[in-house]
Amino acid sequence: MTQTSATTTLPTLRRRATLRRSLGLLADFRFEQSDPDRFYGHLAADTVSILSDIWADAGPTTSAGRASLAGTRILDVGGGPGYFGQAFAAAGVDNYVTCEPDVGEMAAAGIRLASSVRGSGMDLPFADEAFDLTYSSNVAEHVSDPWRMADEMLRVTRPGGLMVYSYTCWLGPFGGHETGLWQHYVGGGFAARRYEKTHGHPPKNRWGESLFNVSCADGLQYAQTLQDRGDAELVASFPRYHPSWAWWMTKVPGLREVGVSNLVLVLRKR
């Protein structure tokens, strides 16, 4: 299986991916349910920084030098309640669209975005090649067919544009989401039942309904299939939350499933 090293192809992002950043994101994880503004606000700002660096390193070269997100047509698939839209606006990006299927999720934080479109990632309501950059952040593990969603994202990405696909790997410590760090290793059903017994209500992410087993190998194989078909080029694959000196984990079968936690695939459409 062919893999591209992010350490050589994404130098700007590599410099940003420090241990301090990783520890800060890790510290925020415990606030996902109790203080979503803090958790998702910081995550959204970090996501904008990641995409800005990826676009600078792997996007089109302009007469002014490296590409900027300003003026770039961006689609966020599964953008949720608006934290990401706010972060893009704060960064000066005004050509951002988010597509979210759940009305309740869209309104959860009380954030109103004129650029929000209700629709399914499995059947995106956009024309072919409509966007320069499409991305999905922590959505793939919540849909029953993540690779159909990825195909849809690639469809609406223009040739030469980028698709960034980031998702939580099931066998990583956060694969079970709010159900705990180890319970999902026993099984998704067990983790959900134990959570409900402990907290008196079922988890937000329900095993087999809105939470699924997606592996690192699944994503890397998908990227390889796209390359073999000539549909896209794998620009890079790396662990989203790790410092750059730990990005080598994506190359080691077995270890990557438990050590990567969240895999990022950067694909350039051909």
Which residues make up each language-model segment?
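A short SAM/SAH-binding and catalytic strip from SAM-dependent methyltransferases
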Residues: L133-S144
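Conserved N-terminal segment of class I S-adenosyl-L-methionine
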Residues: M1-D123, Y135, G259-V264
